[in-house]
A protein has these predicted regions:
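N-terminal binding-site loop/beta-alpha segment at the start of enzyme catalytic domains
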Residues: 1-92
Length: 92
């Protein structure tokens, strides 16, 4: 059984943003600090892209990312996935 996604108004922008968002920190992977990996590891880009695509299928259009997540790698992976989905203009 699939439940319909709930959307909320985003201020006065006219945007309808999914009530549930997807955090993208883990998609950035580990970064090197003092020669040691730090952060999330164990997920590859293909798994990340598949996860993002599934989130979009389920109605998620709100993604939390930062240039600090894998020194920008999370944003690159998110951009790639949304480009493949083909509706980047409706994602926030």
């Amino acid at each position: 059984m699939q439940v319909a996604m709930v959307y909320r108004a985003f201020g006065k922008t006219g945007w309808r943003v999914s009530q549930i968002g997807l955090g993208c920190w883990q998609f950035g992977g580990a970064i090197m600090l003092d020669g040691q990996p730090d952060g999330w590891s164990g997920i590859n880009d293909e798994e990340s892209v598949a996860t993002i695509k599934r989130a979009v299928e389920l109605g998620i259009n709100f993604f939390d990312t930062s240039d600090m997540y894998g020194w920008g790698h999370s944003e690159e992976v998110l951009g790639r996935a949304l480009k493949e989905v083909g509706n980047r203009d409706r994602q926030y």
